[in-house]
């Protein structure tokens, strides 16, 4: 059912309940029966009300049904209503109500499944890689999840900002600089003179060569940087190496079809004084204490679930890594983002309570669950039945660029979204390359391309198809397909609410399956011209909604394959 049809049916049921039990107070909820033969939607409202009303639930259900079906508006929407089990009411909607989705999609087009603008600002931070190497498969999963979540937020009316937080401060940047310096001096990774914690991928050689050649380069949001070529100047090497890798990451993200609205540098939190100001504010508010020469935050007293207090400033000096995180998220709040989402690897689980505790200590008005988190698990890449662990470019891990080069952007995006973020995932390269029904990307895109080909070969112009009589669409597989198309707006809303784009991936696979089942059961290009046009109209409707769903995942909808 379309969302507006569901709301209409809920209102009609509420009116029927009021006529049977004038003083009753209960929320009417509709759900799809687990067995399709039981109906299209069902409610347990009679079971909710039976005990407080001291009524038999089945008898109460019958009274509600009688009152409901006495209304003309209800009969236009509901073909029949049956009592099942202890008091469920199962509804089967009319053919006209099923067919209404075709006109709805025709009127809304690319906006079908979308909601009006709410004006709510949302900041989604994701990828946020250290500028110390190419983006790996974990970053790839973040990129796919993050961009899809942003698209879902936009589809549900939010004003979305995509942000990349660069971890450009700390020991890893120093390790990068000395690694490039060693390579620039001709020291190989297998040499005892190579830095013990140095990076060893081929990209370090590329940086060293460009530094010596005094190349000029520019990241997406930064000023141009020209290498000095002075291999003894570690600061120059560090600045150039960071700029080089930021540019490389930008290029990888461009190849993935992803553009960020804003870049935020961790180093700016120190140069602007935000980190020190944050610490001073926490001390002034009485949420810290000194012990063993270190400064501690009383995180256990701040109601965010942390099981022990945390060190902020180490006894030997320097802040722990969660302190700049607190300063950064306070900045998000001050920038007006009352809704913020972080997409990170599951190894960041321990930081959630600490960051939230720091925010609680800084400002009472910040909700305890701010920011929201989507924590994803690892991705294992398989090829030929064996795990792929090594990339020549990165040296020790498979990169985002590797995946794009091997299977293409569409497959990478879909495969990395199709499972819940909190589950480990095996990326099967062979499956992603296969042209079979087992490959979900191929299966869905083939359905779209098949429809394009079918309509092109039908010899009917768009105007005639658009005016076709949908009342002729009464086959069971047609009803099933229309029901699937009508469910799309609810799936979009659910996926956005739960920050779970895999719901869209599942829905697309199911929709393609329903389309193929209909296509195989009912000839579309029949001799009966009105029926042919009606079926072409259903096919065109399916094509539009498939394209809308694929767009939410950042996946293309090809016209031919």
From Swiss-Prot:
Keyword list, A-Z: Aminoacyl-tRNA synthetase, ATP-binding, Cytoplasm, Ligase, Nucleotide-binding, Protein biosynthesis
Q: Which GO terms describe its biological process?
A: arginyl-tRNA aminoacylation
| Protein's cellular compartments | Cytoplasm
Question: Which superkingdom does the taxonomy of this entry point to?
Answer: Bacteria
The residue numbers the entry assigns to motif 'HIGH' region are 129-139
User: Hey, what's the signal peptide range on this chain?
Assistant: none
Which GO MF terms are attached to this record? arginine-tRNA ligase activity; ATP binding
Record-listed E.C. numbers? 6.1.1.19
InterPro entries reported in the protein's UniProt record: aa-tRNA-synth_I_CS, Arg-tRNA-ligase, Arg-tRNA-synth_N, Arg-tRNA-synth_N_sf, ArgRS_core, DALR_anticod-bd, Rossmann-like_a/b/a_fold, tRNAsynth_Ia_anticodon-bd
Primary enzyme class: ligase
Q: Which GO terms describe its cellular component?
A: cytoplasm
Q: Please name one Pfam family that this protein belongs to.
A: Arg_tRNA_synt_N
Whether Cytoplasm counts among this entry's keywords is yes
Task: Reply yes or no: does the keyword Cytoplasm apply.
Answer: yes
Catalytic reaction equation(s): tRNA(Arg) + L-arginine + ATP = L-arginyl-tRNA(Arg) + AMP + diphosphate
Could you tell me which PANTHER family the record lists for this protein? ARGININE--TRNA LIGASE, CYTOPLASMIC, ARGINYL-TRNA SYNTHETASE
Q: Which NCBIfam families match?
A: argS
- Family assignment? Belongs to the class-I aminoacyl-tRNA synthetase family.
Q: How does it assemble?
A: Monomer.
This chain's protein is named Arginine--tRNA ligase
Organism annotation: Bordetella petrii (strain ATCC BAA-461 / DSM 12804 / CCUG 43448)
